[in-house]
């Protein structure tokens, strides 16, 4: 699907020079005093990971990749891959672990994830917005430390370290955002 350069947004996946590029930063729309308006776009190649700044005229049209999104259930790890199952067809697919990068520790058994496909090839895996995890290591509670909003480091059951409020103890379950690895609330 063709979109105008003015319609490009962060997160869009574009087909440019026969490669897939994700827009990594909000495009800058510029209208100089002399000459035509243009859009400065910072994008990252999905295959190689290289970043590139490109300038497009406001009148340019680019190909936006049409992605298909499906829900899959995480089953298990196999060598360097993640094995997922489509809950409608029970078809299993194997995807390289690198697709998740630093979010890999948040993947838990039977978790439902969204997989984005381009030309029937998996491009990305989107985890749920939040996960519930147990604190396995943190400093003890200090009496009177709840007067100010201060945070202390805590290690979660998956090995990830996050900052949590002073009043939380080892063994408590908390809700964590998978997007930026931040504490949300105590689990209910």
From Swiss-Prot:
Keywords: Cytoplasm, Elongation factor, Protein biosynthesis. Signal peptide: none annotated. GO terms for biological process: peptide biosynthetic process. SUPFAM superfamilies: Nucleic acid-binding proteins, Translation proteins SH3-like domain. Pathway: Protein biosynthesis; polypeptide chain elongation. It is found in: Cytoplasm. The keyword RNA-binding does not apply. NCBIfam families: efp, PRK00529.1. This is Elongation factor P. It comes from Rickettsia bellii (strain OSU 85-389).
